[in-house]
Amino acid sequence: MRIADYSVTKAVLERHGFTFKKSFGQNFLTDTNILQKIVDTAEIDDQVNVIEIGPGIGALTEFLAERAAQVMAFEIDHRLVPILADTLRDFDNVTVVNEDILKVDLAQHIQNFKNPNLPIKVVANLPYYITTPILMHLIESGIPFSEFVVMMQKEVADRISAQPNTKAYGSLSIAVQYYMTAKVAFIVPRTVFVPAPNVDSAILKMVRRPEPAVAVEDENFFFKVSKASFTHRRKTLWNNLTGYFGKTEEVKDKLTKALDQAGLSPSVRGEALSLAEFAGLADALKGQGL
């Protein structure tokens, strides 16, 4: 029997008198086939350390611990710590850290792996309400995670992996794809969770690029420009950028020159631009002193 078997999950929750907290976005997966697929997608073996976020009662942790060198699971809900000590008692390669992943000194914790030099993968069922902040926090942390295989709301996975000229494409697609390749591995129906969420989920596989997707003079400025370009999706690049930089004649003049230099029409929309085109635009705007 597995922790994720519905009868086991139910028994564990009843034994510990656990009640779900909506504020933590708790939805426990009760499908062993899907858990197996997640671990297979992440290509976990004994030469990999794993960071898990939100282990719940240990359903995914169990599958990870069977294959990984070590698993470090960050759980914000202190009520789950004794439950995890119970469900994972047979594993000596799991460490549960009762901390908020957004506030913890992750670089310090990683040094506690027996072999901190092994590749580190992030495998997690992320809380829906805080998926994007957690992902961006980890991606921008400077810690060289080799790969992320994470479950999230399908709509968010679609946005992260979206290509130009699609409805889902936006500043989040650019922010992630600058650092990583991103592809939806498979869909997870809402019916396999306790309690069932209101939407379907997706497993997103993201692999770190050896170098960022495009070379830019100023990364922060590049992200600001891409974000500004999507402020109002139906508006043109010109309208969004004048809304961001200002509408003085001086700004308009610089903007005209930068767009010309980047080979872009003022009437194009942000959703039509590739990462390379955003890079060219950001560098041209920077060159004009904007």
Swiss-Prot record:
Primary location recorded for the protein, binned into one broad class: cytoplasm
Family (UniProt): Belongs to the class I-like SAM-binding methyltransferase superfamily. rRNA adenine N(6)-methyltransferase family. RsmA subfamily.
Keywords recorded for this protein, A-Z: Cytoplasm, Methyltransferase, RNA-binding, rRNA processing, S-adenosyl-L-methionine, Transferase
Gene Ontology biological process: rRNA methylation
Protein name as annotated: Ribosomal RNA small subunit methyltransferase A
Lyase recorded as keyword: no
Function description: Specifically dimethylates two adjacent adenosines (A1518 and A1519) in the loop of a conserved hairpin near the 3'-end of 16S rRNA in the 30S particle. May play a critical role in biogenesis of 30S subunits.
